[in-house]
Amino acid sequence: MVGWKLVVLSILPCLRADTCKCVPGDAVCWPTETALNAFNASLPGKLIQNIPCATIQTNWNSSLFHAWFPTGYDYSYALNCDIPGGNTSSCSLGDSPYYAVNVTNANDISLALKFATQHNMRVAIKQTGHDFLGRSTGYASLEIWTHNLRQGLTFHDSYLSTSQCSPQEPEGMESTGAALWAGSAITIGGAYTWAEVYQFAHEQNAIVVGGTCTGVGAVGGYLQGGGHSASMRDFGIATDQVLEYTVVLANGNVVTVNACSNTDLFQALRGEAVAPMELSSTRPSKHSFLDAVATWYETTPMILEANLGGYAGWAAWDGDTLLAPKVRRLESAFGGFNRSVDDIQESMAPVVAKLAPLNSKGMNIMAEYIAFPDYFTYFHDVHANSMNVGQSIIMTSRFLRSTQLINSTALRQMVNVTAGLPGQNAFTVVGVNGGGAVALDVPNTTINPVWRQSLVNNLVARNWPDTAPYLEVKAAQDDITYVKGASLESLAPDTGTYINEANYKDPNYLVNFYGTTRPTLEAIKKNYDPNDLFYCVTCIGSNYWYQQANGPLCRKDS
């Protein structure tokens, strides 16, 4: 019996090296102490071994704190245990990376990728940890931690790429008079947050298209997922703005990627005045409030037709929601560039007129019109947020076309389901910023085309305290996946999902996330990463792998 065990153990590491990513204890592939020391010396001294530590308890709800640590993640549902937590009596690394490289330049990244390849290690990449899907972590992985890769922000009055190339302007976009973009640009030299980039752009009297959560990294998953913004209706999706990347490939080579150099990779990386309104109930009637919410959805095409864009949030029950009102209310804020208050008010008159009858049905409709001196002030006063972290959250989202937004019956059914029940902490965030520049046929992108065809992105989520028992957590996950998410998909079966604010448990994620772009993206990944060094949950190519419980990542065809 002992001899049989020894035979199995001696064969298993060899099989795992071919079919699974290496994990601690694999004698054949896991790096020895000598190899690790040599690797650390080559960096030099930037290799970190991650060890669970109870002292993080006091800073668990700080996004900035999580950003400063290689295993700090804003939303903890994907981790092995919550701190302070109610589901575990002890804490281990779980799915967090085993080692991290504190990279400060491209050469560090190159060395890390080559080391991971040599030892068949899983690779994770993390900047700030603002990640709803668990894409920046991985069991027993080597993490490339980019938080301290900061080589400056540079403003260019007139852009010229390193390869004398710029993407062509899409037809219909205001032209500079040249066939290629030659206007102003900003080089973001590494791991800067949107808060830092916004401030820098403001000092240059410029506007950048970026996220509303200002602690999010400006370069990374936000742009690769597309990136929605308060200014996108006027300027386009965030990834449309990218002129050039400097990229470290899976083989460790550093290359320039733009519309003339490595164009297929450039295409893949570009993938994926104000009028606030408030709608609240003066008596505790869920039914009348949801009628009003459904009517409000019907006004969103009118808001966009008035050349305004922005966001709304609503909740049907009092609760501790993360991103929406904590009482029964719908709040929204929409802005327009170079518009007077009188002009905005006149443009919004049809919207107000459609909502006004709700005042006689127990609703309280309020509209306020405010002028701001510049976009920077407007954005920070109205839209910018740091978002409370350290709680667990699961969400789903759906793009809605105009046809869905005028279907009163179907809208009311969706609103009733997504509103949820008391105690669920269910809430909805609505991005009303489609059309305009978003709808332009921009070249060299692999954004899901349904985004450009849609007017609204509707996000539904639930969050729960870290002391929630496992069965309660599982119920919330199933509710978002099979009830609320299914309701959104029933309303808009032919659209898709914004992949950065999505459900990592979505059983149909390949279609919902990528749509018709999937074959193109898979071909590009195979070309640049034939051995699948890069993997993340729900990312392109992830369907060919499976994660063992508390174990390695393995190929499905094994």
PLM features: residue spans?
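Soluble FAD-dependent oxygen oxidases
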Residues: 2, 18-558
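Fungal secretory targeting signals
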Residues: 1-18
